[in-house]
From Swiss-Prot:
Domain of life: Bacteria
Family, as annotated: Belongs to the type-II 3-dehydroquinase family.
This protein's name: 3-dehydroquinate dehydratase
Record keyword DNA-binding present: no
Entry function: Catalyzes a trans-dehydration via an enolate intermediate.
Pfam families: DHquinase_II
EC assignment: 4.2.1.10
Coiled coil: none
Key words, A-Z: Amino-acid biosynthesis, Aromatic amino acid biosynthesis, Lyase
InterPro entries in UniProt: DHquinase_II, DHquinase_II_CS, DHquinase_II_sf
Organism encoding this protein: Aliivibrio salmonicida (strain LFI1238)
Pathway: Metabolic intermediate biosynthesis; chorismate biosynthesis; chorismate from D-erythrose 4-phosphate and phosphoenolpyruvate: step 3/7
Molecular function, one GO term: 3-dehydroquinate dehydratase activity
Binding site for substrate: N77, H83, D90, L104, S105, R114
Length: 149
């Protein structure tokens, strides 16, 4: 691990529409605002932050593969891929990088098909229903874990 920890933030499909799409579920902040706030927080915590949002499953998988031996922790909001992607699960398990799963909305208070996650049983933790604050809590938790190891 480098002297400065590196954390990768991954955001899945339709999160590029934050601020426009169903604000009652996802809030009014757009993704750029969320990432900017996280970047400020990461700087204050003395960690490097990388970010990728993609609507394409393979791009998220490639980012996970490229994180191997380069990234210390992943924070992922897989969005709709949460409920469908064995491939994302396998990629995360393959690189053996600890990760936290984040969801803006409380997926358990929504449609039944959103209740299952292919990732949560392998995640260090899951944060859902706290809006954009969930990312900030995940970043703090990731840094705390990295510093305690």
């Amino acid at each position: 691990m480098s002297t400065q920890s590196r954390i990768l933030i991954l955001n899945g499909p339709n999160l590029n529409l934050l601020g426009l799409r169903e604000p009652a579920h996802y809030g009014s902040q757009n993704l750029e605002q969320i990432v900017n706030a996280l970047t400020i927080q990461a700087t204050a915590l003395n960690v490097e932050l990388e970010h990728l949002q993609s609507n394409r499953e393979y791009e998220l998988i490639e980012a996970i593969h490229n994180a191997y031996q380069r990234i210390d922790f992943i924070i992922i909001n897989p969005a709709a891929f949460t409920h469908t992607s064995v491939a994302l699960r396998d990629a995360l398990l393959g690189v053996d990088i600890p990760f936290i799963e984040v969801h803006l909305s409380n997926v358990h208070a929504r449609e039944p098909f959103r209740h299952h996650s292919y990732l949560s049983d392998k995640a260090v933790g899951v944060i859902c229903g706290l809006g954009a604050d969930g990312y900030e809590f995940a970043l703090k938790a990731a840094v705390k874990r990295l510093r305690s190891n």
